[in-house]
Amino acid sequence: MRFTVGIALCLLLGLGGFVYFFIVDGRVPQSTDFNPSIADIRRLANAPAEERPSAIEVEFLAEDQLPFFGLQAGLDFRSATMARSAFRLKSNWGNTLIDVGMDRYVAALFKTGKKFDDTSLARIGSAMVTARRIVVTHEHPDHLGYLPRSKSLDTLIPKLRLTREQIEATAQYMEDGRIPEAFRGVDPVSSKGFTSVAPGVVLIPAPGHTPGSVLFFVQMADGREVLFVGDIVWTMSNIRDETGRSRLVQSVLMQTSEDRPKTYQVLRWLISFMDQNPDVLVVPSHDDSYLRELVASGRLVQGFGQLQP
């Protein structure tokens, strides 16, 4: 009897350890080696006010429903909405797109975007044609997938500022599995330092979620500052609770495994950055309720084309 009880206890302890390690543990380290100089970034973002962005638009292209523990480590089984979004910075200099989403082919290929808005996709397509600059936060399908499949790709090439990792990833979104020929002549943006990609807009390399992950720091025309963080966090509670994604999500459920140590290093920096810079607006890509709060408060405008060009 004692032997049976002992075996049962060992199994329970083993199961508990497994659940904790793979699902519950999302502790963020207390220190980080990721320390981009915000002073240098601000200097690089400095540009004439009339050329910097004056407004930010957001498209809600698609969405998925999943339990909250898919967004943040833990055992929260509440249903959460994961938005698939794209952003446009409106400027007299010319508009800048941050992420371009995916079409239905890519969404089906990667089994994402269950609720899909074709009208939103059409607006994103038109915005790519009229934009002066196009950038992406990283190379995952819901951020980059539509770009290489655009029928206007040849005319979009001069507008692009992509890293080498982002360019190489375009192959997986094509039926033939090859990088489109139009990309062959593209000179990639450096993944080693900060790059001004448009007046008031600075690219900050932040590998971890993917090798080509970047942040975008924006100085608006009125002096406001915005930080687009892509998928460093999937919900703002990752920052508030200092809790990242679980190992199960990072290693098993994502299309490609996430570099947990690097991602958590960037997350620790982001937590500290927000604490030291509370007036900077942080914009993640997937937190549906938070993004809609920003729309309701007027800090984002929903829908490309809702403002005059």
Model region roles, listed by residue range:
Residues M1-L15:
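N-terminal Sec-pathway targeting helices
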Residues G14-N35:
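Membrane-interface motif at the C-terminal end of an N-terminal transmembrane signal
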Residues G26, L121-A122, R224-E225, V229-P309:
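Cap/insert and terminal regions of metallo-dependent hydrolase folds
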Residues R43-A45, T119-S126, T130-D142, S152-P205, ...:
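Metallo-beta-lactamase
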Residues D64-R133:
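Pre-active-site segment of Zn-dependent metallo-hydrolases
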Residues V100-D103, E139, H209-T210, G230-I232, ...:
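Active-site metal-binding loops of divalent metal-dependent hydrolases
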Residues G145-T155, E293-G298:
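Metal-dependent catalytic neighborhoods of phosphoester/phosphodiester hydrolases
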